[in-house]
UniProtKB/Swiss-Prot annotation:
GO terms for biological process: mRNA splicing, via spliceosome. It comes from Kluyveromyces lactis (strain ATCC 8585 / CBS 2359 / DSM 70799 / NBRC 1267 / NRRL Y-1140 / WM37). GO terms for molecular function: RNA binding. Keywords: Coiled coil, Cytoplasm, mRNA processing, mRNA splicing, Nucleus, Spliceosome. This is Pre-mRNA-splicing factor CWC26.
Length: 268
């Protein structure tokens, strides 16, 4: 007998067999547990699916409740939900676009049929109300709060800016002709107020006064060198020695002579 055979008989073979048996037993136990769990889960799913189909078949056959069975994913419970057939039509008679049946009918019957259609459409709109609120998001996908208010404020600001621009353009486009017309209007209104006979009795309005606050003569008067206006009590008689008139005549003659000399001395 060799040494290897002796060691295998006395030590190696028994322990190896026991270890392999234990590992095999453990793996078989695990597989059986997992298979039991999977099968139990499958049975639960199949049972729930069978329940839903059976209940739906019952509701469809009876057609009294008009409800169908659905599973709520949040609570994980089966619930009955009212089923609304908005597009349901009567096969026996044809309906018009208003909802009334085609053919000879009374006014009351037509009103009833139209009211039924409106009621069904209202029910449909009531079901869709939950999904009517729009959600605004930015480029990264985050929800923007108060986006509609910001849009309204921007539109308001744009309108005010537009009005300002239009006013500025109007002011810029006003030329000298338009400005002169406006000035003439103001002058005409002032003349009308002075020439109005009702204003003649009003001594305080439209009176010429000096720097000291004294009333001045409002009609025509002869010129003088210093531009002094006579008082309002002057009777219009010139009582001077005629020096002012001679002075103005001489000054005009000197100015005329200067103009003549300038024109004759020019070389063409």
């Amino acid at each position: 007998m060799s040494l290897n055979d002796f060691l295998a008989k006395s030590y190696g073979s028994k322990h190896g067999k026991e270890k392999t048996k234990k590992s095999k037993d453990k793996s078989s136990h695990r597989k059986s547990d997992e298979s039991k769990r999977v099968t139990s889960r499958n049975i639960d799913i199949i049972d729930k699916a069978n329940l839903i189909t059976e209940e739906n078949k019952k509701a469809a056959s009876s057609n009294k409740t008009g409800k169908s069975l659905w599973k709520n994913l949040e609570t994980e419970k089966l619930e009955l939900v009212q089923h609304v057939d908005v597009d349901k039509k009567d096969d026996s008679k044809e309906r018009m676009s208003s909802g009334a049946f085609a053919g000879l009918q009374t006014a009351e019957e037509m009103e009833k049929q139209i009211a039924e259609k409106e009621k069904l459409s209202m029910q449909k709109s009531g079901l869709l109300k939950k999904n009517q609120n729009t959600v605004y998001r930015d480029e990264k996908g985050k929800v923007i709060d108060g986006y509609e208010e910001e849009l309204k404020l921007r539109e308001k600001a744009n309108l005010t800016a537009k009005v300002r621009k239009e006013e500025e353009l109007k002011i810029r486009n006003i030329g000298e002709v338009q400005i002169s017309k406006l000035d003439r209007k103001t002058e005409k209104s002032a003349l009308l107020s002075t020439e109005d006979p009702l204003n003649q009795g009003n001594t305080l309005r439209g009176t010429n006064t000096s720097l000291l606050g004294r009333r001045l003569y409002e009609k025509n008067f002869p010129e003088n060198r210093f531009g002094i206006v006579p008082g309002y009590r002057w009777d219009g008689v010139d009582r001077s020695n005629g020096f002012e008139t001679k002075w103005f005549a001489k000054s005009h003659d000197i100015a005329d002579q200067k103009i003549k000399e300038q024109t004759t001395n020019r070389e063409f």
